[in-house]
Amino acid sequence: MQRMKSLNVIGCGRVGTTLAALLQRHGVCEVQDLYSTTLQTAQETARFVGAGTAAARIADMRPADVWMLSVPDSQVASVAAALAKQALAYPRPSMAFHCSGFLPASTLKPLQALGWQTASVHPVFNFADPVRCVAQFNGTPCGLEGDESAISLLRELLTAIGGDCFSVQTGSKPLYHAAAVFSSNFMAVLQAIAREGWSAAGVPEALIPRIHESLLRGSVENLLVMGPAKAITGPAARGDTAVVAIQGALVSQWHPEAGEIYREMSVLARRLSTTGSTASPTEARAA
């Protein structure tokens, strides 16, 4: 890169704040203008990043080389339309990307119509707290999709801040993102059910975090070292059908939705332990 690219950010949540801070602090981009749902949020992000001017409206944002739209999926299209309206007054097209793992770059079509290069970037990372995220981002896989020229620039920018970039096929994005949901988001739901179950079973509240940590750490370590098929344990994996049936019924009495999850997960656990895959034989042959 010959010079720092100017960067504008629309959406100062955890993802936008983290990426803006990394791009600024690594000397990759010069953060210029920041816009969010409230002016205060944009101002707080500017302070955290150490650069940038908070804008009260998208219309107040100056032209920039790169635009990051780190907004909820439901807002990407409308924000792109608002930016395209403003961009009519800009001297030349720019490059814009959104951070949705689900939506394709074509969601930014109002900008594409103006000659902008567009892409989507999905860092495969749990953005919980910007301070921790900035410190832990190095080595994060980043899925890229969109225009080749935009992908080329983003690969350069993200690699410079520690990202490990790979390409995602446009038509595969929904399934790709669903896999990430299974890997990360649903894990939190399952852990919450486990904690609630221990509490309902009378386990002392002070002991629950220790039980939780012991099981979770061991499971994660085994998964990373051995892979899912060899790491799977429990009554379903062992084929203890009587235990599974009784336990499933009891769980359903306590928590109907959790009972349904227990039954379905038990089927998949048994299949994984015996065949090495959660897919049914018919599904596996079709694939």
Name every feature range the model reports, one short phrase each.
Residues M1-R57, R62:
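NAD(P)+-binding Rossmann beta1-loop-alpha1 motif at the extreme N-terminus of oxidoreductases
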Residues T17, A21-R25, R47, A81, ...:
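Short, well-ordered alpha-helices that flank and scaffold nucleotide-derived cofactor binding pockets
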Residues D33-S36, A96-C99, L144-E145:
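Short, hydrophobic beta-strand segments that form beta-sheet elements in well-ordered domains
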Residues P209-A287:
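NAD(P)-dependent Rossmann-like dehydrogenase/reductase catalytic/cofactor-binding core
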